[in-house]
């Protein structure tokens, strides 16, 4: 199985879309202080994906047949099903297959993301090839993988 391990912020959700969820939430009626983010409807919960980034992502997925594994911190704010619904809303041709696990360890975001990817790969031996697309520089942690 081919896998694309995908971050969101800085990859498919570019800086010009950051905060778009707040506008959507306001239009929806506003998030109450007592509400967790998971209680906000999926279509209002996340920032918008960039249309050009989605086009490129769809081309890569179609050309390679890769499955998506989400490494983004967005995994903290919804289920795999929620993320699949959001991918549909954003026009992504495939729903995510899985999330990388959350590593209970201290360290930089780059280290933790690298360890999460490594743990996911260790638990999924059927992966024949993979790539991680992330705006974090994880080159210092290639020894993890």
Enumerate the language-model features and the residues they cover.
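Short His-Asn-centered micro-motif
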Residues: 6, 71-77, 133-135
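C-terminal cap/substrate-recognition subdomain and adjoining C-terminal extension
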Residues: 81-145
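Short coil/turn segments at beta-strand junctions that form active-site/ligand-binding loops
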Residues: 1-2, 64-66, 126-129
